[in-house]
Amino acid sequence: MSTDLPPLSVLDLSLIVEGGSAGEALRNTLDLARHCEALGYRRYWVAEHHNMDGVASSATAVLVGQIAAVTSTIRVGSGGVMLPNHAPLVVAEQFGTLATLYPGRIDLGLGRAPGTDRLTMRALRRHLDTAGEEDEFPRNVVELQAYLDDAEPDQPVRAIPGVGTKVPIWLLGSSLFSAQLAAYLGLPFAFASHFAPDLLDQALEIYRATYRPSERWPKPHAMVGLNVICAPTDDEAAMLFTSVQQRFLGMHRGRRGPLPRPVTPAEMEAMWSPAEKAGVMRMLSCAAAGSPATVRRQLQALRQRTGADEFIVAAGIHDHAARKRSYELLAAA
């Protein structure tokens, strides 16, 4: 991998493609994880989404375990577990079990978004009154940290497995609140600029300026999320990128479904209005698409702008072989 870029990691949503199935998406995730491990990527993270026709990564801890089982060196983790959907003790037991089975390889990224709609939130038994969520989430993070740390004398409730594993916790988010909390707790921070980039620069500035050193993380450590489509030529990458553009256009219109097949750039232009295009491209402002040389220049500019310690890369490509090739070309860029 290029020495003038930060370490690269993978964010895989296990996207269900148009004409495909959830089973195919999960099998492709396992195959891509093996491929990216061989290419030298640092981490392989999967997300938590519920009741979405186009996303198969709902049982995050299960998927992390499956990926860890078919790989041997790459770090595997959640990007992330939506903590308000779960009891901290349960998450500690799940990831403590994973860390016990795969020591030194498990990451625990935490977010506070629902990852779904309100009806599904109710089905998940998540509290629908979010008025106090900004108070509850920090308490839950601290509680989870305590379960994974060494036990206190006479501690009445412990995570077994989990206690003493000290699974690295990351805070994920796209808000200034998340940046401030990560800084206050002395945790690494992953900004979700792959879909919500508006506050990226301000969040990183606040995170670094207010960071309180911790034993594990004496300095702030920032990861920036990107959409990257790499192909042999700029023209091919532009066509592959239309799948991502169509997906975000659907989100812009309030519709979510399988990842669409790519279209020509001219066909893409006919799909959206100027206002829709502006909105989608704003959401995709932290994206790179092109040949290896083009992508490298774009990532160098993002590194210079953000000072990112790591990039985590999503590749919403309809064809699995082309997706694997994109990560291959990126690793060599």
Explain the meaning of each model-derived region.
Residues L8-D12, Y44-V46, V76-S78, I106-L110, ...:
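Hydrophobic faces of well-ordered beta-strands that scaffold small-molecule active sites
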Residues F177-A179, A183-D198, A203-L204, R208:
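A conserved active-site cap/scaffold subdomain adjacent to cofactor or substrate pockets
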Residues D12-R27, V81-P88, V163-G173, A231, ...:
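Active-site mouth loops of central-metabolism enzymes
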Residues P7-A22, P84-D149, F189, P197:
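Flexible, glycine-rich active-site loops centered on histidine and acidic residues
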Residues S2-D4, R122, L128-A159, L199-A308:
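An alpha-helical appendage that flanks or caps ligand/catalytic pockets
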Residues S2-T3, E37, V64-T73, A99-R105, ...:
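Acidic (Asp/Glu)-rich catalytic clusters
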Residues L8, C36, G40, E48, ...:
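Conserved, mostly hydrophobic/aromatic
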